[in-house]
Amino acid sequence: MAQEKFSFRKETKLKIKFLILFIFSFNIQSSNLVLDFNNLIVNNFEFTQKTETNSSTTESKGKIFRMENEIKIEITEPSKELYRIIENKIEIYDYDFNQTSIYQIDDNNGHVLDFIINGVKKAVVKDLTNSSFSIKNGDNDILIELNEDNGFSLTYIDNMQFKNIINFQVIK
């Protein structure tokens, strides 16, 4: 009987050690993937965005350039636009209509911009796999998938309930 109690305690301690090791390794995996993403996001990118509406799919193309105090997003197709992100505002230049607008970035409109500017905080990561994770975006999630050739993709549902897939590739 004493032998059984000793064996049970030893087995329980072993299970606890395995559980701790599993949780620790999951946390390391999470940290590495998020760290890889945050290291990747500081580059300049070319991107293609596909938006699936109820009846069609539209495609936009452009580039993202990071400078010391601003981020420039140039849309080259299907129309020409420039977005300048400086501190907590975004300046929009629509070259086709010769219009300029300035908006404040806040919690209601800045989820995707926030992690493109600042990276992802490990605390908001969920649904982690070897090459992807999700983060909360208002009522929806944003799926981030890293690919092996210095790029990543974002998949999310926007505020109009349209599915968006954006593929980013580092400019070399």
Q: What positions do the PLM features span?
A:
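Bacterial N-terminal signal peptides that target proteins for export
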Residues: S7-F18
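Short, solvent-exposed coil/turn segments at beta-strand boundaries
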Residues: N39-V42, F65-I71, I85-K89, L128-N130, ...
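Flexible, surface-exposed loop/linker segments and immediately adjacent secondary-structure boundaries
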Residues: N98-I135
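Gly/Pro-enriched, hydrophobic low-complexity segments
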Residues: D127-K172
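An acidic-aromatic
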Residues: I64-V112, N159-N164
